[in-house]
């Protein structure tokens, strides 16, 4: 799994919001990320929403802590991080066709241009990057 430095939350063009570890937070986090309006490309927005959903769902199910979603625009790159307070690193699992879970990190890997994990003093940030197709 790729590793990288934590997201620089002090950059201009950076927004963040905390969410409770509840199932409704997945849709709220998707709306938060898309509301930034940093892409007007439908495919990019679908990829953003899908990968955010997967990472937030993992935080809700596995970390079970309040989590922070940070969105940074740097040039033509949109970088999103989901930071939780669990030190347990995500594990990409093999899955069976009929299993309802286990596909999340496979989806992240397929849709994100880059992704990884940054270990924090407390917890971790799972992040991904997408290149903007069109400037909003």
Language-model features, listed with the residues they occupy:
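Conserved beta-strand-loop-beta-strand hairpin that lines the nucleotide-binding pocket
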Residues: 1-16, 60-136
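STAS-typified acidic loop motif
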Residues: 16-30
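Conserved short strand/loop->alpha-helix "switch" segment adjacent to the catalytic nucleotide/phosphoryl-transfer site
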Residues: 27-53
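Histidine kinase transmitter module recognition
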Residues: 36, 40, 58-59, 118
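Short, well-structured hydrophobic secondary-structure segments
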Residues: 51, 56-61
């Amino acid at each position: 799994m790729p590793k990288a430095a934590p997201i620089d939350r002090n950059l201009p063009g950076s927004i963040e919001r905390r969410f409770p570890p509840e199932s409704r937070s997945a849709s709220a986090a998707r709306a938060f990320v898309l509301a930034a309006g940093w892409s007007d490309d439908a495919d990019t927005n679908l990829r953003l929403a899908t990968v955010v959903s997967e990472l937030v769902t993992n935080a809700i199910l596995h970390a079970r802590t309040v989590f922070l979603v940070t969105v940074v625009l740097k040039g033509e790159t949109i970088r999103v991080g989901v930071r939780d307070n669990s030190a347990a690193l995500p594990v990409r699992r093999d899955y069976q066709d009929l299993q309802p879970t286990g596909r999340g990190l496979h989806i992240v890997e397929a849709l994100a241009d880059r992704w990884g994990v940054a270990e924090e003093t407390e917890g971790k940030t799972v992040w991904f990057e997408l290149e903007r197709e069109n400037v909003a």
